[in-house]
Amino acid sequence: LFLIHKMAFWGGEDMVRAKDYTWQKSRYTLLKGRWGIAIWIEAGYLMTSEIEDKNNYTEISDHIYFESMIPSSSDNIQLYADELLHFCSGLKMISRHFHEFLPEGMYLIIALRNIEFSECYVQIEGFTACAIQWASEAFHFSMPKIEAYFDESKAPNGQYIFDFSSV
């Protein structure tokens, strides 16, 4: 029933494209302070020999592109532009791993089709870390070390401080 709803909403062409992707679910969690971050995503990748219109995608690096496939409806959480930028930033940080996986002359498209999180317990850098974790799981490389600590002095409820320098 859920798949039928998605098919009807996405339309035939989007559903056919989505079937070609290799999908992977991932859950990023961080709990080191008074509150935690939890982000669940489903993202996928597709290798292709050509991309018809690169303007429909965000370029991550040479031959690697991103697109959001999150259906726009009241049932789905939508990411703001800055949240998508942070997600893509995570993919850019580890793009060298994609190039190891990608055959020469091919393109890699990464798509995000579902995301869930509590707007009360999320911080924008969490989207960066979430993208890195998803990629490490989907492409089977070791999760890079992301340092994070909770700074209770940041008003009003504390803030996580992330260090991506070792990524």
Language model region names:
Residues 2-167:
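Accessory interaction regions appended to the cores of large information-processing enzymes
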